[in-house]
């Protein structure tokens, strides 16, 4: 592979990564909004916003769906926790 081929291939890969990044951001936005709505529903019905066992099971399950389970175990608690921040601030 010559330098031009390398540069073209690297650019293609970067563009593909950027497209996935954009998809991830859009999906995270949707997930956070749904989770916030769920927190509000739980609050209206006097249910706890945080159920550790449910979140632990979800993380374990999601970890089985990837070749990078440590990444899920690192990211998902932050993602799920972020959705609870407004609820926790009101307590």
Segments and roles (model prediction):
Residues 1-91:
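Domain-level signature for soluble enzymes in the chorismate/prephenate branch of the shikimate pathway
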């Amino acid at each position: 592979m010559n330098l031009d081929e390398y540069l073209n291939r690297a650019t293609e890969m970067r563009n593909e990564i950027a497209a996935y990044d954009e998809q991830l951001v859009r999906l995270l936005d949707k997930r956070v909004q749904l989770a916030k709505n769920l927190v509000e529903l739980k609050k209206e019905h006097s249910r706890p916003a945080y159920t550790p066992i449910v979140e632990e099971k979800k993380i374990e399950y999601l970890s089985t769906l990837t070749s990078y389970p440590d990444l899920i175990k690192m990211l998902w608690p932050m993602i799920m926790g972020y959705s609870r921040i407004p609820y926790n601030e009101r307590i």
